[in-house]
């Protein structure tokens, strides 16, 4: 059997569609709420997900400019009485008085597969009714013991703090930030929510503090360092960054894939194939590396 045929058959298996659980996804949709609060400039808003009785998870950056946030569900508002904050991971858990919303089950980021279908549910633009968007897992990146999720599930302003769900309705991530230029959207792992529940409750707003994705460029993790050169199509710079990445993380399949992509864009085809092969040696289901090899062959 030829190498190209093997690649095509593997890709066909990798991209198999999974069935979705309509009932549990509707429950996930019903768990989405709006976070609001007045600021010096007007009204701030974001999204949140009910993850326990009277507990709503959102992004801390949603709470930076308001002294008195509240939660809206439908046409009813509920006061926020406290918050447990993990500023660096940009996750805040709000205590909400008498919130009549069922919590969603928490999933995890460890078992996610590249290409897996997912659903984003949130309140883009501050819309009172939750909006849904479909997408796929592009990659997961190990960061401080858990996996930050890169997906194609689009979101706009107001969706920060919204939920990313698998097709069974489990919360797998919290939609947080995106990179301009090449349409990739990052979610923080739901795995960080349980440790958040153990933090001390604070009662003073606003919540300030730098988040991981706001780190100085030279201190960012490599999966964020590649964003600017990819956006600017600066393939030589991408080659430099990804060479450093594979040197520091030689067993990272995504690092080798990105190096291969840089080589391919620089017409270093032989080097690209070596890098893609290395990515597949680490993870034989790396569908991006498989696809690029299929294109080359």
PLM regions and their residue ranges:
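N-terminal activation segment of mature serine protease catalytic domains
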Residues: 18-50, 56, 68, 210-218, ...
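C-terminal cap/linker of serine protease catalytic domains
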Residues: 19-25, 102, 171-240
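Active-site region of chymotrypsin-like
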Residues: 28-39, 92-103, 129-201
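Conserved active-site neighborhood of the chymotrypsin/trypsin-like protease fold
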Residues: 41-45, 52-130, 145-148, 157, ...
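Helix-start (N-cap) detector for alpha-helical repeat units in TPR-like alpha-solenoids
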Residues: 219, 253-254, 287-288
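Structural signature of tandem alpha-helical TPR/SEL1-like repeats
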Residues: 232-241, 265-278
